[in-house]
UniProtKB/Swiss-Prot annotation:
One of its GO terms (biological process) is phenylalanyl-tRNA aminoacylation. Tetramer of two alpha and two beta subunits. The keyword Nucleotide-binding applies. Belongs to the class-II aminoacyl-tRNA synthetase family. Phe-tRNA synthetase alpha subunit type 1 subfamily. Keywords: Aminoacyl-tRNA synthetase, ATP-binding, Cytoplasm, Ligase, Magnesium, Metal-binding, Nucleotide-binding, Protein biosynthesis. Binds 2 magnesium ions per tetramer. The gene is pheS. GO terms for cellular component: cytoplasm. One of its GO terms (molecular function) is phenylalanine-tRNA ligase activity. Mg(2+) binds at E265. This is Phenylalanine--tRNA ligase alpha subunit. InterPro entries: aa-tRNA-synth_II, aa-tRNA-synth_II/BPL/LPL, Phe-tRNA-synth_IIc_asu, Phe-tRNA_ligase_II_N, Phe_tRNA_ligase_alpha1_bac, Phenylalanyl-tRNA_Synthase, tRNA-bd_arm.
């Protein structure tokens, strides 16, 4: 059956545009508008068929008919574009209403925690010594007795080696312990680095202490070691005075009291002037220090006739207690975020 000829008259094209405009205007959703577009602007729409029929016209009529078809398509397309913009605006307005945030509602955000003050103090100590030209050094927390005791001049019968003071690692005879101080880093540094050496080590240490107001079985130490030609106790004193002022302010002062440590000779206890001491200011024990024992230097292959050195060690928990007036060390280890919040450093 032969196809019906397409009507290309002005009236037929006007009817096609009018039908398309009505269909677009009646579409209430974007899906309905898409269907109307297919029907009135698609490949089988009246306007598309009119364009296809241009080829069957005489050449003398094609130009005029083509202009009229293009005008019709432009008008229909304009109707579609206007309705599309209107429906999209309606959709966006509905989304804004549905997803709007009620700023008057109480917040459901979890409160921000705070970094632990020991972490903050450790970074502050590291910054202090790095600013003086020192380097950072680290060592393992599970240490051999060779580095924890032997190389530091502890005699075989020293009480610190016993299970009453030190955590020994199974099996028996492994000669491994949880390090009781950060001093093993001294030996490792002297064996691994070329002289001169100026290093600071900050880390956890372990002892079989009961947890109470002034002791904890896991605590943090800062250990300093300097080995160079011509170092004396005066250099040690100047270094610790600078350290004290950095932590306690201009009022920070130190004094030395003679003491004994296996790995330093001469040795001293370091006291810090504690202006916040209950009952008034006074001297409080801060840590230990001294000149590196020649036996320790020899164990690391260093000639003590050529090089000398000094070392010192302080507990970070003890330093925090003095500096911030914290009466009970247990607050530092119980994990209550309320303890950290007053220090004012967000996570």
């Amino acid at each position: 059956m032969a196809e019906q000829p397409v009507d290309l008259s002005d009236e037929a094209l006007a009817q096609a545009v009018s039908a398309a405009s009505r269909a677009f205007d009646q579409a209430s959703t974007l899906d309905e508008l898409a269907k109307a577009k297919t029907e009135h602007l698609g490949d089988r729409s009246p306007i598309a068929l009119a364009r296809q029929a241009l080829g069957s016209l005489p050449k003398t009529d094609r130009a005029d008919a083509g202009k009229r078809v293009n005008v019709a398509r432009t008008q229909a397309q304009a109707g579609y574009d206007d309705r599309l913009a209107a429906l999209r605006a309606e959709r966006d307005a509905e989304v804004l209403v549905a997803e709007r945030i009620d700023v008057t509602l109480p917040s459901t955000r979890q409160p921000v925690g705070a970094r632990h003050p020991i972490t903050i103090l450790a970074e502050n100590v590291a910054d202090t010594f790095v600013a003086m030209g020192w380097e950072l050094a680290e060592g393992p927390e599970v240490e051999t007795e060779q580095f924890n005791f032997d190389a530091l001049n502890f005699p075989p019968d020293h009480p610190a080696r016993s299970e009453q003071d030190t955590f020994h690692i199974a099996p028996d005879g492994s000669r491994q312990v949880l390090r009781t101080h950060t001093s093993p880093v001294q030996v490792r540094t002297l064996l691994e680095r070329e002289l001169p050496v100026y290093v600071i080590s900050i880390g956890r240490t372990f002892r079989t202490d009961e947890l109470d107001a002034t002791h904890t079985p896991v605590f943090h130490q800062v250990e300093g070691l300097a080995v160079d030609k011509g170092l004396t106790m005066a250099h040690l004193r100047g270094t610790l005075d600078a350290f004290a002022r950095a932590q306690f302010g201009p009022q920070g002062r130190t004094r030395f009291r003679p003491h004994f440590f296996p790995f330093t000779e001469p040795s001293a206890e370091v006291d810090i002037w504690f202006p916040n001491k209950k009952g008034g200011p006074g001297w409080v024990e801060w840590g230990g220090c001294g000149m590196v024992n020649p036996n320790v230097l020899r164990a690391c292959g260093i000639d003590p006739e050529v090089y000398s050195g000094f070392a010192f060690g302080m507990g970070l928990e003890r330093t925090l207690q003095f500096r911030n007036g914290i009466p009970d060390m247990r607050d530092m280890v119980e994990g209550d975020v309320r303890f950290s919040l007053p220090f004012g450093v967000g996570a």
